[in-house]
Curated annotation (Swiss-Prot):
Domain CBM1: start-end pairs: 25-61
Keywords, sorted A to Z: Carbohydrate metabolism, Cellulose degradation, Disulfide bond, Glycoprotein, Glycosidase, Hydrolase, Polysaccharide degradation, Signal
Pfam families cross-referenced by the UniProt entry: CBM_1, Glyco_hydro_6
Keyword check for DNA-binding: no
Protein name, as recorded: Putative endoglucanase type B
Highest taxon of the lineage: Eukaryota
InterPro entries: Beta_cellobiohydrolase (IPR016288), Beta_cellobiohydrolase_sf (IPR036434), CBD_sf (IPR035971), Cellulose-bd_dom_fun (IPR000254), Glyco_hydro_6_CS (IPR001524)
EC number: 3.2.1.4
Enzyme class, UniProt record, top EC level: hydrolase
């Protein structure tokens, strides 16, 4: 999958060249005006006020009140880097009741996560045989880490059915497992890039084909109503509508993306299901020029769908590399204040609440975020980035009330996109200096990348 991050010049402009005098303050509406490590001036242009959203982020919002020096000023507190203890591959234990959880409940609490056989077979049959000794032993441990299973084509829906059958069998034997899956087949998919273009096109009845795809998923979920399922909904799609409508393919897909996302979450609003809409990552939508419009869009989708009770919140950092809580700001994040995922979700949640989506919760992909900083030259370099490692294991022990769990959405070792410039799905990001090459097509096994993740894993598998 791909994140074509066109972080437009206005994003940088919103943070650039702060002036000293209040009367000439350049921090306009939705710009940052304070927070931890903020080096600019704590002021806003006329007609706006500086509002503290959290310790990390204060923002200029419409209003005439004068900014508070305590709300807007930079904090002297320094965040510490989170390190995990042990190598547990499941969430905290507990019992699963026969009744579905309330919408306010964390779906990750009280269950174990299922390590699906598809990823296990990739690791055991493709990765391990090419390794030896301690490294082969370490690689085999990766197969035990629960990751999401991607339904990136209609035909791959059957893999979910197979996995749910395995889970039901294990649960009848006394287990308490939940399955994790990604819904990822919108028509005109991956509109701002090429690496993960999908099977449906809007000009070839793609909308109706997508509805049939959703109907197939719904039927299976209803057949397994006794099994808890967690869904990630359409990586990249809505985020592209925030930043990439200047791309013709995205502009043409805008209304369909919105309508079909609403359709999907309404149809899949089942008692045994919990859903998280994909919301990019801090290096994409976390920029001050993007985070306000993003909150409006996501809240509107949620409201247009009738505020489905099984939509728990948002997932961030899918297939990306951002750390959760960093003590040092990586150079490649430039002036972005929300350069790690904890800062991002804590800046995002209050804005969503203002737009009508309150009590939103998050899950955060940390599957490839173990090495910080990475080898990226820009935070938007999404394709097979060098210098990355397996990260924090799936867990509900996040230390933040907004974060339900750390998860592995992207199966580590599957390629982000091909580096073959002659390929139909070649994207230039996969040919950048900071992308590992040669790389196969998106979704296919990339042994060299798996070994990089294993070598740099934090916590280590060795």
């Amino acid at each position: 999958m791909a994140y074509k991050l066109i972080l437009a010049a206005f994003a940088a402009t919103a943070l650039a060249a702060p002036v000293e005098e209040r009367q000439s303050c350049s921090n306009g509406v939705w710009a940052q005006c304070g927070g931890q490590n903020w080096s600019g001036t704590p002021c806003c242009t006329s007609g706006n006020k500086c509002v503290k959203l959290n310790d990390f982020y204060s923002q200029c919002q419409p209003g005439s009140a004068e900014p508070s020096s305590t709300a807007a000023g930079p904090s002297s507190t320094t965040a510490t880097k989170t390190t995990a203890t042990g190598g547990s591959s499941t969430t905290a234990g507990g019992s699963v009741t026969s009744a579905p959880p309330a919408a306010s409940d964390n779906p990750y609490a009280g269950v174990d996560l299922w390590a699906n056989n598809y990823y296990r077979s990739e690791v055991m049959n493709l990765a391990v045989p090419k390794l030896s000794g301690a490294k082969a032993t370490a690689a085999a441990k990766v197969a035990d880490v629960p990751s999401f299973q991607w339904m990136d084509t209609y035909d791959h829906i059957s893999l979910m059915e197979d996995t749910l059958a395995d889970i039901r069998k294990a649960n009848k034997a006394g287990g308490k497992y939940a399955g994790q899956f990604v819904v990822y087949d919108l028509p005109n998919r991956d509109c701002a890039a090429a690496a993960s273009n999908g099977e449906y096109s809007l000009d070839k009845d793609g909308a109706n084909k997508y509805k049939a795809y959703i109907a197939k998923i719904k039927g299976i979920l209803q057949n397994y109503s006794d099994t808890k399922v967690i869904l990630v909904i359409e990586p990249d799609s809505l985020a592209n509508l925030v930043t990439n409508l200047n791309v013709d393919k995205c502009a043409k897909a805008e209304s369909a993306y919105k309508e079909l996302t609403v359709y999907a979450i309404k149809e899949l609003n089942l008692p045994n299901v919990s859903m998280y809409l994909d919301a990019g990552h801090g290096g994409w939508l976390g920029w001050p020029a993007n985070i306000g419009p993003a909150a409006k869009l996501y809240a509107q989708i949620y409201k247009d769908a009738g505020k489905p009770s099984r939509v728990r919140g948002l997932v961030t950092n899918v297939s990306n590399y951002n750390g959760w809580k960093l003590s040092t700001k990586p150079d490649y994040t430039e002036s972005n204040p929300n350069y790690d995922e904890q800062r991002y979700i804590n800046a995002f949640a209050p804005l969503l609440a203002q737009e009508g989506w309150s009590n939103v919760k998050f899950i955060v992909d940390q599957g490839r975020s173990g090495k910080q900083p990475t080898g990226q030259k820009a935070q938007g370099d999404w394709c097979n980035a060098k210098g990355t490692g397996f990260g924090l294991r799936p867990s509900t022990n996040t230390g933040d009330a907004l974060a339900d769990a750390f998860v592995w959405v992207k199966p580590g070792g599957e390629s982000d996109g091909t580096s073959d410039t002659s390929a139909a799905r070649y994207d230039y990001h996969c040919g950048l200096d900071d992308a590992l090459k040669p790389a196969p097509e998106a979704g296919t096994w990339f042994q060299a990348y798996f070994e990089q993740l294993l070598d740099n894993a934090n916590p280590s598998f060795l």
